[in-house]
């Protein structure tokens, strides 16, 4: 589980996330509390030539009431205080990113996916976020199977508010509805 806004991935790609003394911040979300500057001069140069198509299963923004810390933190074991801290650190990170990287938009749908990896991809790379469920439904040609089915069972372990935020069972249910099929979670 991650909730560092994609910083760990970006550090591996050569980005510098620096504290007030010019040192790399600690790994994980806790390092964000010391972040004051982001530099890309050591980033892998080939990144500029790459296009990324990211399968994203949620539409949550990076921060706020529907952000990754508030919505997904509890399922990752975060306490209320940890959620407040991570929310604050991610908001500061987004502001710092916006100073040097014009594509930074923490409110864009999907930026809160995978603990903020969506934000990292959109801000620091040539990426587009695509609905993970739409991508999978297309690649597996599930529509052909649903058309001929009597009943559709998603196998989702728990249907909750997060399910409605773009998870696979909703995509399957919408497709089944198109053909008037009964769906069980």
Language model region names:
Residues 51-59, 154, 184-185:
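Short beta-strand segments
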Residues 58, 62-101:
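Acidic, glycine-rich loop-and-beta core segments that form the ion-binding/anion-interacting portion
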Residues 85-152:
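Oxyanion-binding "anion nests"
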Residues 150-151, 157-185:
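C-terminal non-catalytic interaction/assembly regions of soluble proteins
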Residues 1-8, 117, 161-172:
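Short glycine/serine/threonine-rich phosphate/pyrophosphate-binding segments
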Residues 2-50:
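Glycine/threonine-rich beta-strand-loop-alpha-helix active-site module
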Residues 59, 127, 157-161:
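Short glycine-rich anion-binding loops that position phosphate/pyrophosphate groups of nucleotides
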